[in-house]
Amino acid sequence: MAEETKGHIGHSKSDQRRGLAGAMPRKLNVTMMGAGSGFTNSVLKDVVLIPDSVGGELRLIDIDAERLELSRKLMVKVLEAVGEGDKWVIRASTDRRELLPGTDYIINSIEVSGLACVRFDNDIPLKYGISQNIGDTIGPGGLMKAMRTVPVWLQILRDAEELCPNAVVLNYTNPMNIMMLAAMRVSKMHMVGLCHSVQGTSHMLAGYTDVPYEQVQWNCAGINHLAWFTEFNGPDGNSLYPTLFEQATDRTSKFATEEPVRSDMMLHFGAFITESSGHLSEYLPYYRKRKDLLDKYTDTGYRGEESFYANNWPTWRKNQDDYRTKLFTGEEEIKPERSWEYGAWIIESIEKNQPFLIHGNVANDGCISNLPQDGCVEVACLVNANGIQPTRFGRLPKVMAAICDSNMRMFDLAADAAIEKSKHLARLALTQDPLTAAVCSPAEIFALVDELFEAEAEFLPGFK
């Protein structure tokens, strides 16, 4: 791989929160799907803070009129707080077809069914012995979130193809791999799936090795939430893995106790993985299938706590809403700072034609030669005026590719199930899920999926 795709040309720039060189050449129409979410005001603040912007329209779309109105009012406050109110016009609607025409960039953060299915996705699988920590991208919870979300996502893309076919689509909604895989099979829109796990993990590893982030160099590739840091080197080009292996071998070290699953996977398979230990454990057949393994390899919170997401998401949602209200009333400060989320940096890079490196979820098509070519992978992508261009990684080490591939088989069937609205394909998809298959028989998996479909029928129209 070319040197410019190693490390963090883009990551370093976003970490420093500075903009790219050059002026924005035109006014932009940026449309936020699922604008009632707490993510909206952060990612759109990033957009309006692009240096030398000439503004445009921020278009907010959500089917929840109450949450949409809060986002609209808060975005007005954001523009005032950062001194950009004279450049941007805010429009809001519950009808996406009203605001999609003329859109240049679509940022997707929809959440279908809100909190209504969180307990179903967790508690019904638990009856069958399947323990989940997060349960929204893989396993029974991830499957059902895909079945609820993908059909709506595809409707959005069909409208976009009709009303703004040249728009660039930036997807943040999970389950990322299934969302992007279904989209790539149905839509011709130029799109990428975005996650912050590569940025976050690379920063974390730099901290554990006591090397300034701007001095480390690394290579990372795989699938979303299961991408491997195949290289992690210091400024002299020497591997920093010996330092990490030394810490991981001492199971009482901070590194091992904070990352029980990720450090164990590194010790056995040779490289560190991008997602938190608890969430990663859901992608694997090793750590959650017996109580003794759960006791040994998981801990509280994101380190693997059973039902962590289901037990806490309603509270997190309320806290997020309370925080947004405080931002609006002035009880909390709106800071004129950009985040390290990729969205606005991609827009800036394309518009200014300044190269920027991201890690994105894209069609494989040769990027990783020993993973399914019609699958979705997470690799380094170069961004400039030509759009988002995936780079070729080559071959993953065989065992790393095999672990990714075991999940991609589930994603493949799940994407087809969501596109075709097929309950049977959904059943088959879950038989290929590594954790579920380690716990349940095929008959039990079929019964589990049927029970989930019955419980969530309100949000699954048209499935047969």
Functional labels for PLM-detected ranges:
Residues P101, I107-N108, N171:
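Redox-cofactor binding/interface segments in oxidoreductases and associated redox assembly factors
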Residues N29-T31:
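Conserved beta-strand elements of the Class I
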Residues L49-E84:
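Glycine-rich phosphate-binding loop and adjoining beta1-alpha1-beta2 segment
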Residues A116-R185:
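Rossmann-fold NAD(P)-binding glycine/threonine-rich loop
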Residues Q155-P235:
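Internal, well-ordered domain-core segments that constitute the primary functional module
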Residues V89-G102:
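Short acidic low-complexity segments
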Residues G36:
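Conserved glycine-rich cofactor-binding loop
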